[in-house]
Amino acid sequence: MNTQTAPSPQFYLTAPAACPYLPGQMERKVFTHMVGERAPELNDLLTQGGFRRSQNIAYRPACETCRACISVRILANEFAPTKSMRRVLAANGDIVSAEYPAEPSSEQYNLFRRYLDCRHQKGGMSDMSVLDYAMMVEDTHVHTKIIEYRLRVEGDGINDKARGPLIATALTDRMSDGLSMVYSFFDPALSERSLGTYMILDHIRRAKERGLPHVYLGYWVKGSRKMGYKTKFLPQEHLMARGWERYSVDHDSIKPATD
């Protein structure tokens, strides 16, 4: 009988670096590699524990003097869109979305570059090459899909693949208890469509249809304008010191989860 067990994951700590969200703060991260047949199970456990995935690495903040990054997940089954969200859905009624294996394309990369060049010129991803993008999409050992959003054109619905212009893309992990939005981007020239909001609403719909209770949005950082949109999707839970807790304005003064 084979009594060997799979090795436990090894965790590492990064060196301090400037925080991309809060000026004057330094960030550190704890991370581990997710490879092999246990990767999907490990991804589930770590995401539920406040980690995020980037390629085959799972990481979470481990900052020495700050606990501003809080993991957020939407309660999909209880979610009801606000009036403004219903307007976003109506305004994007001409969009066709489809789910594909995690495979990059030149069309995706061109959209990705336009998005970065407009929205994140000074960010850590601003110099990503086509090879970097391909690795971001393909380097996964978990259940990852690419969701493409295209404008509907005449003839869509007759063939399997939509043919309209690609205007948004989401890289998404399917887990045992929900969908995790790893990264998403959209055409910055179509800002009036609120495509970021639309993609989150679409993921909530997909989670409901599959009987999955959560949509994981990553980290919310109080005081960061970039992250403010995440608390608009209610009800939601935040990972605090005592575990996942239903969010309310009072949570702003509650201590988040620590190592």
From Swiss-Prot:
Keywords: Acyltransferase, Cytoplasm, Transferase. Its main location: cytoplasm. GO terms for biological process: ubiquitin-dependent protein catabolic process via the N-end rule pathway. It is found in: Cytoplasm. GO terms for cellular component: cytoplasm. The keyword Cytoplasm applies. It comes from Sinorhizobium medicae (strain WSM419) (Ensifer medicae). Its EC number is 2.3.2.29. This is Aspartate/glutamate leucyltransferase. GO terms for molecular function: arginyl-tRNA--protein transferase activity; leucyl-tRNA--protein transferase activity. It catalyses: N-terminal L-glutamyl-[protein] + L-leucyl-tRNA(Leu) = N-terminal L-leucyl-L-glutamyl-[protein] + tRNA(Leu) + H(+); N-terminal L-aspartyl-[protein] + L-leucyl-tRNA(Leu) = N-terminal L-leucyl-L-aspartyl-[protein] + tRNA(Leu) + H(+).
